[in-house]
Every structure is written in structure tokens, then in C-alpha cells.
A protein has these predicted regions:
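Hydrophobic alpha-helical membrane segments
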Residues: 57, 81-97, 119-124
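Juxtamembrane helix-break-helix junctions at the cytosolic face
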Residues: 64-78
Length: 140
């Protein structure tokens, strides 16, 4: 079995990638169903914003992966990838600040079920970013 060189293996980039893929897949898993995009009680404009949110999750994830894995590694690319990877989760958390918002539709309890995914995802980005920064700084 091949031994992994920890100094060369970009585990931090893998952590950020896991967060990005989770965002891309998770937004569709959570919203492509009868409670969201296929909800007959939702007006077309609400579905428009839901579709926009799913597409935004995919676009941010693809941009993250591009900046993370493109040739010519750099600290700037890592910084960009980490910021982009965090945008979806941070904006999701900010939704509570807007009037009349709820984390779920009635009759379900508004207990922010998204937090069990959003906080670990942001944690992966943070740990991945710090780990990769450390790895890059040791290579110099």
C-alpha cells in the first residue's frame, strides 16, 4: 500500500472540496421536492427564488473547485476558494435577519434544521483553509 506524504497531500483542499460538493448536492437534495420547488402552494415567484438559490449553490461550488484545483497553486487562489465556499452558508445564516422569514414552512417548528449542515460545512472550510495555509507556508 502506498504511503501518503502528509506534507504534499492537500488535505485542507480536500476539506474545502467536501464542503463545496456538499453545498452543490445538498441544495438540490433539500429543495428539489414537494416542500420546495414542487410545492403547489408556492407562487411562481417563490419558486423562482428557490431555483435561483439552488443554481447559486451549484455555481459557488463550481467556482470554489475551480479556484482550489486550477494549475498554478497560490495563496490567492486558496483565499478565493475559501471565501467563495463560505458565501452560501453565510448568506443562509443571514436569512434570520430579514423580517417575516422562517427556516421551515408551517406547520413545522421553526428550529433551523439547516444549522446541522451549514455549521459543519463552514467548519470544514475554516479547518481546510487553515490546514492548507499551513501546508503552503511550510513548502516555502
Amino acid at each position: 500500500m502506498a504511503k501518503i506524504n502528509r506534507e504534499k497531500f492537500p488535505i485542507g483542499k480536500v476539506f474545502i472540496s467536501l464542503s463545496a460538493v456538499g453545498t452543490m448536492v445538498g441544495s438540490y437534495v433539500a429543495d428539489w421536492n414537494e416542500t420546495h420547488i414542487h410545492n403547489p402552494t408556492w407562487p411562481p415567484h417563490a419558486k423562482f427564488h428557490n431555483a435561483q438559490t439552488m443554481s447559486m449553490g451549484a455555481a459557488l461550488s463550481l467556482a470554489t473547485l475551480y479556484h482550489l484545483w486550477k494549475p498554478g497553486r497560490s495563496r490567492e487562489s486558496l483565499d478565493s476558494a475559501a471565501i467563495i465556499a463560505s458565501v452560501y452558508g453565510l448568506t443562509q445564516l443571514s436569512a434570520v435577519l430579514y423580517p417575516g422569514t422562517a427556516s421551515v414552512d408551517p406547520p413545522r417548528e421553526d428550529n433551523w434544521p439547516q444549522l446541522k449542515y451549514t455549521l459543519p460545512s463552514l467548519g470544514l472550510v475554516l479547518v481546510g483553509y487553515l490546514t492548507e495555509r499551513y501546508r503552503i507556508s511550510r513548502k516555502r
